[in-house]
Curated annotation (Swiss-Prot):
Cofactor: Ni(2+); Zn(2+)
The name this protein goes by in its record: Lactoylglutathione lyase
Lineage: Bacteria, Pseudomonadati, Pseudomonadota, Gammaproteobacteria, Pseudomonadales
Organism from which the protein derives: Pseudomonas putida
CDD domains per UniProt: GlxI_Zn
UniProt function note: Catalyzes the conversion of hemimercaptal, formed from methylglyoxal and glutathione, to S-lactoylglutathione.
Length: 173
């Protein structure tokens, strides 16, 4: 479908309000049961960098902010890093409610079973075949391998809470 056709779909505002010209999609948030397992997955498996952490002791939760960025671009100064983090796209916020990791029966709903809701996040990689081979070697659980189904150009892996992470490459296979 052409961009022109996309802009004529019902509900689409083709000419955005100029007031939104500098808006940036900054982050999305996932609630996680075991922060150590989640940090390991997102930093070791997917290469995210932990760029900030905020603790709310009285409310018994912590926020962890991760991004796929060159570590050299992360400001060392706390205030500068807070400002920088608010300006970059694609930040992943992990919310950990303290104590959930010790409750064997506790689980968050990932949204891909009934009742359906949230679906997935997506990470773009330079070589999806090599990335999937690495995920296999790391024993990362797959929801969909490249060889599953007709869409053999993408895969879905699962994080420790069962959230799906789509894996694609920007160029054709």
């Amino acid at each position: 479908m052409s961009l022109n056709d996309l802009n004529t779909l019902p509900g689409v505002t083709a000419q955005a309000d100029p007031a939104t010209a500098q808006f940036v999609f900054n982050h999305t948030m996932l609630r996680v049961k075991d922060i150590e397992k989640s940090l390991d997955f997102y930093t070791r498996v997917l290469g995210f960098k932990l760029v900030d952490k905020r603790d709310f002791v009285e409310a018994k939760f912590s926020l962890y902010f991760l991004a796929l960025v060159d570590p050299a671009t992360i400001p060392a100064d706390d205030d500068a890093r807070h400002q920088w983090m608010k300006s970059i796209p694609g930040v992943l916020e992990l919310t950990h409610n303290h104590g959930t990791e010790r409750d064997a029966d506790f689980a968050y709903h990932h949204g891909n079973t009934d009742p359906r809701g949230f679906g997935h996040i997506c990470v773009s990689v330079p070589d999806v075949v090599a990335a999937c081979e690495r995920f296999e070697a790391l024993q990362v659980p797959f929801q969909k391998r490249l060889s599953d189904g007709r869409m053999n150009h993408l895969a879905f892996i699962k994080d420790p809470d069962g959230y799906w992470v789509e894996v694609i490459q920007p160029t054709p296979l």
